[in-house]
From Swiss-Prot:
It is found in: Cytoplasm. GO terms for biological process: tRNA methylation; tRNA wobble uridine modification. The keyword Phosphoprotein does not apply. Its cofactor is FAD. This is tRNA uridine 5-carboxymethylaminomethyl modification enzyme MnmG. GO terms for cellular component: cytosol. NAD-binding protein involved in the addition of a carboxymethylaminomethyl (cmnm) group at the wobble position (U34) of certain tRNAs, forming tRNA-cmnm(5)s(2)U34. SUPFAM superfamilies: FAD/NAD(P)-binding domain. It comes from Jannaschia sp. (strain CCS1).
Amino acid sequence: MFHVKHRHFDVIVVGGGHAGVEAADAACRAGARTALVTLRKDDLGVMSCNPAIGGLGKGHLVREIDAMGGVMGCAADASGIQYRLLNRKKGAAVQGPRTQSDRALYKSAIQDHMRNVTELTVIEGEVADVIVESETVCGVSFTDGQSISARSVVLTTGTFLRGVIHIGHETRSGGRFGANRAIKLAERLSAMNLPVGRLKTGTPPRLAAKSINWEALDHQPSDDDPTFFSFLTKRVRARQIACGITHTNPHTHDIIEQNLGRSAMYGGNIDSVGPRYCPSIEDKVVRFADKVSHQIFLEPEGLTSETVYPNGISTSLPIDVQLDYVHSIKGLEHADILQPGYAIEYDYIDPTCLNNRLELQDHPGLFLAGQINGTTGYEEAAAQGLVAGLNAAFHAQDRDPLTFSRRESYIGVLVDDLVTRGVSEPYRMFTSRAEYRLSLRADNADQRLTPIAADLDLLTEERTSEFTAKMERLSRGYDILNDLVVTSKQAAAAGMSVNADGKKRTGAELLAFPSVELSDIAQLEPAVGQIDPATAKQLKIEAIYAVYIERQNQDAFALKRDEAKSIPADFPYSSVVGLSNELRMKLIKTRPSTLAQASRIDGMTPAALALILTKIRQTQRLSA
């Protein structure tokens, strides 16, 4: 039994994972009296899989969540023990901030934050039913018979709906290792005639740190100049560490191949589809048989933790085989397994039954966020939680809904992909999914989204003040640069490599040349030297991308204009250079008749559509 002061809320959030935390926080910031229902209060902020936040595409989502005043970015920075900027050698648009997190510190940061959220009541219990009257949601009931009411309900059930854990041929019920699954709620959703499917994900065995031969391994240190997730973070909060790097080898692969029949997936126990971009070690050995090794990152789970997460060897093989293949790997010859790897199957709802507010079209007031919508990853879940939580609050308050467009955010790309295309496998965010990715950079997430959050009164005074100060610094920087006008001859005399065309250029236009830095321009205008490093970096990025963004917008418009273009029945997809094997196989199988049909294929990206369009035009020119 549980006891609460109030039985009526504006919003009820079911589930306390990354989506649930973000949804509850967002609803409260929007002024809604909110109940967060979770099986165990102590599990708020638990990282069920790998102890890391961010990555390619994912890091953009975290920065956008933070720009909207969300929780994840600050928690990631409070617990970050190894910062890495992925794709560092590439342009800012496709760089991905990532941090290794201390599990305990992350959980503590989340719980500390949630304890101080006004209008929030956290309830321990298991929801058995969503109460619906005349197709409209009005609350939830619990397995003990009690109920609470609300105009909006957000379901963020993760992998708990009819969750089944597989370790070899052994199966057990569970929402994750050591946690019960949700059966009654899953049955209720099925009874509502929602389009329910099954997906799977997996996790590797956890290893004892003291049993690893660290001296035999390569090491990957943290970046010297970390890229933080929150725009409020000014310094590293935790001691930084290195991760170990090792590799599988032919002997490892032999052990796995010889025992494929004992794998839950290859032994026939699992029919559902797993994440393509996070395959199990069995999948890697089978699908990439030509590879003699696969990289493994040995990620400490915390500064004081004795557990190591071997990223790259998730599995559903039995424990004895896991031990054998782990011991075949350099540095892990005597490693102890603290928790076996496993696969988990769970129910999800086809997200095409949702609108772009993540609300069920046929059940006003019922919102879904996270893995229940067919996604994978903490970041994707948190982003959906933000969208669902805000819109659940606005629904309860009879306010206008908030939608995110593809043009302004990765959050918009994520939601649009889910509700228009659906999923056939767990969905993961990549920069290639965004046609406007040159302008949707991690560095400018606040410039794109914080004004929206400010208009909705979702921000703290600290965040509003920080953003205002940043924009004032940028404005002053642009004023200084635009007031400076020089000829190409003057620029060359100052050592700048620009076109010798006699054209006069502003300082901002000079900065667009890749080889020109603000320090070069400062030779002509001393005031430029007074611009702080963070502002200088932002000005440089924006100057570099200005021309490319205009071209990107033209390409996106052209792609939209040509959606009706026919694709020949015998179109040679195999000869389209740059097309991923995944999409090539899907296109050959489905043979879409127009670009519009091709765009609706699960996993299709704007970049891939552009490649197909270019090939169509090339083929037409050759046959003319």
